[in-house]
Amino acid sequence: MNLKHPTRKDHILIKVVNNLLIDLPTPSNLSIMWNWGSLLGIFLIIPIITGLFLAMHYTPHMNLAFESIYHIMYDVNMGWLIRFIHVNGASFFFIFLYLHMARGMYYYSFHYKEVWLIGCTIYVVSMATAFMGYILPWGQMSLWGATVITNMLTTIPYLGQYLVQWIWGGFAVGNPTLNRFFVLHFILPFIILALSIIHLIFLHSKGSTNPLGMNSNAYKIPFHPYYSSKDLMFLLLLMMIMMVIIFWNPFLFMDAENSLEANFMKTPVHIKPEWYFLWVYTLLRSIPNKLGGVLTMVFSILILFLLPFISNFNYITSMSMINKLLFWSFVVNMLILTWIGGMPVVPLFETMGLTSTFLYFIIILIYSNSFLMINKS
């Protein structure tokens, strides 16, 4: 008797999902550090869905944006919950994104060039999306953050000033800026979603790394039910943690200054972005020259794109003690940069920021080429 194949293997659309998420051959020794990718997918969908409901009640106008946020919080049924899930979900998304990138660096996953480059592109687009979302509540930090960050474009020779005024839609941040940021903040997550699918396709065509860094083609197991059940358990745990934060301290990841309505006549004592951009902000302000600070910030992201091209290695070297020392030094330095970014600009933090900026580039360059150093020693 001929046994009919399951529908998931024959249907022209369902079999694509089946090959990516169900019958996917997966190395049998993946650790919990390989969970972040699936969690990122879930925590990308959550802000998209909640953002759709928020957009139904938000008004992108200078005189109404701040009031519309409070309208959502107080008047819309469960609006407060939708907003807090959206905001804290975005913070969790960036936590998982940094952990996902750190795992990729630790296990030298950037030798999968297409996968790594698309992943870095997703990170950049996510940064742009989150920045625009930070502006929409139209609080004090929203206004002055938009003014400071968009002003960086004035460092572009000849075109800079015109480009800034074109983005603003005038001679200062105003209604046109808010409208444009609202539209882009709505559209960009769908671009991230499309890039994530391409990221998955390239990853599964090349195969994944594993903790040992060895070829795992000899023994693989299907993704479902072995890893899908593990991912689901971890997802439920993290969802519980997020809900505890939402019900206990929903403003944990937010700045208190942004609870004040935007005021062009009053500047905050310390203008700073969301916590997940503080490390980049430290690099920007560590250089006393405006152009130098912007270039430093650009190169800090660009160097991630260049990792597959500047690295010299023949196999995974995450087992090396030198590499472990370099990697964890890099992690500690990133945490220091993040901490300094939230501190006021005083001589002590300026010196620490400049030192940490220098170490950021030095460590990442040595780490990417440490295999050569080991071979030569």
Curated annotation (Swiss-Prot):
Membrane topology according to the record: Multi-pass membrane protein
Subcellular location per the Swiss-Prot or TrEMBL entry: Mitochondrion inner membrane
CDD domains reported in the protein's UniProt record: cytochrome_b_C, Cytochrome_b_N
Any one GO molecular function term: metal ion binding
InterPro entries: Cyt_b/b6_C, Cyt_b/b6_C_sf, Cyt_b/b6_N, Cytb/b6-like_sf, Cytochrome_b, Cytochrome_b_C_euk/bac, Cytochrome_b_N_euk/bac, Di-haem_cyt_TM
Bound cofactor: record note: Binds 2 heme b groups non-covalently.
Similarity comment: Belongs to the cytochrome b family.
Name of the protein this chain belongs to: Cytochrome b
